[in-house]
């Protein structure tokens, strides 16, 4: 069996699997359980915080054969099809590659038709801010009065580029950056489940370097494990990230505290030989 990258293997399949975003999960769960369903949702936030994943889970919640619920069964044909990316009534569109008005009109032509197998036909439009003005104008009427069997879910990193007329027709949810601690705990859980040998400082380095993005963290984790030949060690992670080791860092801080310019210059020369990432170095000093 071919290797599956960690970001895909550990993609959340339920709301309970999600890391962070409790304010969004609570609102969506209550709406689903009370059957107070809106026709259009907009998820905003930086890269890798769970926008597309959340949209797919929402599609599963809406189409589970056991009924609309915040806790889909995960075992019926619809749930399995969503998880495997083959649910025909979940139409995923990358707006960045379909910016033209003709593309949007082609998409909307099928809106009137009933779902093939599911309860709802869900249109997931990723990076929706990439739509042209004409595309937004074309979708506006359908977005205002869509058929009862249609739900729109938009995801974007730049909601300021979306026209107010579109924003006003959507329920908007802003997904926050994840904290280093949240990322740290998720990485540790994954490493334990994967039976990967690691040390905790290496996890902390990756969690800080991810800048609030779980996807970036897991991509770095994949790289670091490959770099370390199946293990995760602080020295290997520092080499990968271009950061300096703790001994040099402590020496740098101590020479500053002691106002020792000669020692400071010597340490800086030693660090320079390693071609570090100076932005990362300053971040560690802070």
List each language-model region with its residue ranges.
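P-loop/Walker A NTP-binding region and its immediately flanking N-terminal helices
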Residues: 1-172, 182
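Extended, largely alpha-helical regulatory/partner-binding modules appended to the mid-to-C-terminal parts
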Residues: 84-88, 103-106, 119, 151, ...
């Amino acid at each position: 069996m071919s290797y599956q990258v960690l970001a895909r293997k550990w993609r959340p399949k339920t709301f309970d699997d999600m890391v962070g975003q409790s304010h969004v999960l609570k609102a969506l769960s209550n709406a689903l359980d009370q059957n107070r369903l809106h026709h259009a949702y907009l998820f905003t936030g930086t890269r890798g915080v769970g926008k597309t994943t959340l949209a797919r889970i929402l599609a599963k919640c809406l189409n589970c054969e056991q009924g609309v619920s915040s806790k889909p069964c995960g075992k019926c044909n619809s749930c399995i099809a969503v998880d495997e990316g083959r649910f025909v009534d979940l139409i995923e569109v990358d707006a960045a590659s379909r910016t033209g008005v003709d593309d949007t009109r082609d998409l909307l032509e099928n809106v009137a038709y009933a779902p093939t197998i599911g309860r709802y036909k869900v249109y997931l439009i990723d990076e929706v801010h990439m739509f042209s003005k004409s595309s937004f104008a074309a979708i506006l009427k359908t977005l205002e009065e869509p058929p009862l069997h249609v739900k729109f879910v938009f995801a974007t990193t730049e909601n300021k580029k979306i026209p107010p007329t579109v924003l006003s027709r959507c329920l908007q949810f802003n997904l926050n950056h994840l904290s280093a601690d949240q990322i740290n705990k998720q990485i540790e859980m994954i490493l334990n489940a994967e039976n990967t040998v690691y040390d905790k400082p290496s996890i902390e380095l990756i969690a800080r370097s991810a800048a609030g993005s779980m996807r970036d963290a897991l991509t770095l984790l994949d790289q670091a494990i490959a770099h370390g030949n199946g293990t995760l060690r602080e020295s290997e992670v520092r080499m990968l990230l271009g950061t300096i080791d703790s001994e040099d860092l402590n020496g740098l801080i101590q020479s500053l505290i002691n106002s020792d310019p000669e020692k400071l210059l010597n340490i800086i020369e030693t660090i320079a030989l390693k071609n570090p990432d100076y932005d990362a170095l300053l971040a560690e000093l802070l």
